[in-house]
Amino acid sequence: MNKRFKDYINKKAILKSGLFDKKYYLSTYPDVEKSNLDPLTHYLQIGAKEGKNPSKEFDTKYYLKNNPDVKEIGINPLVHFLRYGAKEGRNPNNLFSTEELVAKGILQLSRD
């Protein structure tokens, strides 16, 4: 799968999930506007590596600390969570479980 198509699929899954909050991301990290990148693209390419959170509901540093295998393979932590982690029972932060976020309607998991 080529990188452009993979990026498209990842962005689509993230937007559908509800775990990327553009307003939160821009207000929490004002430097993002200076990057000339769309905020979601910034998170995927730069922000996650810097430990930035895509929303209040997903803690990038927490997820990587508690899932060292994710850090080791180098996949974006939010992408990993949506593809595998949620189904494996991994939590997106230290405040809520995956089940709680789904029950509250914050997280939308795909059925694939």
Could you tell me what each predicted segment is?
Residues 1-112:
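Charge-rich, low-complexity intrinsically disordered regions
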